[in-house]
Amino acid sequence: MQYKLTRIDPDAANDQYPIGERETVADPLVEGQVHKNIFMGKLEDVLNSTVNWGRKNSLWPYNFGLSCCYVEMTTAFTAPHDIARFGAEVIRASPRQADFMVIAGTCFIKMAPVIQRLYEQMLEPKWVISMGSCANSGGMYDIYSVVQGVDKFLPVDVYIPGCPPRPEAFLQGLMLLQESIGQERRPLSWVVGDQGVYRAEMPAQKDLKREQRIQVTNLRSPDEV
């Protein structure tokens, strides 16, 4: 599996995310086994898997919304959907206590600096979910006042399509984020291990489900959905 390595450089020339340099590399744990004995290599693998397990099953969302997609997001916290099953029911009012931010709704140019400031106030490790067509690409608002995709100023980990997406789509996006976190390679501290962040290159769902969707011949009417 290929990984995207991001090394943070505070003195980087660019002021956009990701700050620093980014390159595609192989799995760092696999490559590092050549220079380690079996015990230390296995210990690092188990320790990394344990830390990632704790991170992905205890994701605290930041209570933040922009438009109608936020209503669908909050619906996922109700009893019929029960987002507590995934350990993400602890809504935080402060970005300093949150693990991930969901950009749900239309991002206007005047709001972009505010969103970026809130993202900077979040502590590492942190993740971003772009929810809805407006957050992904501007949606139907192809005008001067709307940012055509929040990934122009934030590093987005998961994109959720729809206008607006259903709560089930948000839950699936959360599970995809958990899967991605489970395969990340992060330093255990600021003095232990490689100080780069390795993110696995996850395949797009449209590519994984392409053959399955092509084989669908019985199309239901909107009343039956």
UniProtKB/Swiss-Prot annotation:
EC nos: 7.1.1.-
Kindly state what the record says about how the cofactor is bound. Binds 1 [4Fe-4S] cluster.
Please give the InterPro entries that the UniProt record associates with this protein.
Answer: NADH_UbQ_OxRdtase-like_20kDa (IPR006137), NADH_UQ_OxRdtase_20Kd_su (IPR006138)
Sorted alphabetically, the Gene Ontology BP terms of this entry are: aerobic respiration; electron transport coupled proton transport
What Gene Ontology cellular component terms go with this record?
A: plasma membrane; respiratory chain complex I
TM annotation in the entry = none
Q: How does it sit in the membrane?
A: Peripheral membrane protein
| UniProt cross-references to PROSITE patterns, sorted A to Z | COMPLEX1_20K (PS01150)
Can you tell me which residues bind [4Fe-4S] cluster?
Answer: C68, C69, C134, C163
One Pfam family named in its UniProt record: Oxidored_q6
Q: Which UniProt keywords apply?
A: 4Fe-4S, Cell inner membrane, Cell membrane, Iron, Iron-sulfur, Membrane, Metal-binding, NAD, Quinone, Translocase, Transport, Ubiquinone
Q: Write down the superkingdom of origin.
A: Bacteria
According to the UniProt entry, its GO molecular function terms are: 4 iron, 4 sulfur cluster binding; iron ion binding; NADH dehydrogenase (ubiquinone) activity; NADH:ubiquinone reductase (non-electrogenic) activity; quinone binding
Spell out the reaction equation it catalyses.
a quinone + NADH + 5 H(+)(in) = a quinol + NAD(+) + 4 H(+)(out)
State the compartments where it is located. Answer: Cell inner membrane
Q: What family does this chain come from, according to its entry? A: Belongs to the complex I 20 kDa subunit family.
> Which HAMAP family does the record associate with it?
NDH1_NuoB
Functionally, this protein is described as follows: NDH-1 shuttles electrons from NADH, via FMN and iron-sulfur (Fe-S) centers, to quinones in the respiratory chain. The immediate electron acceptor for the enzyme in this species is believed to be ubiquinone. Couples the redox reaction to proton translocation (for every two electrons transferred, four hydrogen ions are translocated across the cytoplasmic membrane), and thus conserves the redox energy in a proton gradient.
- What's the protein called, per UniProt? NADH-quinone oxidoreductase subunit B
- Naturally occurring in which organism (per UniProt): Pseudomonas aeruginosa (strain ATCC 15692 / DSM 22644 / CIP 104116 / JCM 14847 / LMG 12228 / 1C / PRS 101 / PAO1)
Question: What phylogenetic lineage does the species belong to?
Answer: Bacteria, Pseudomonadati, Pseudomonadota, Gammaproteobacteria, Pseudomonadales
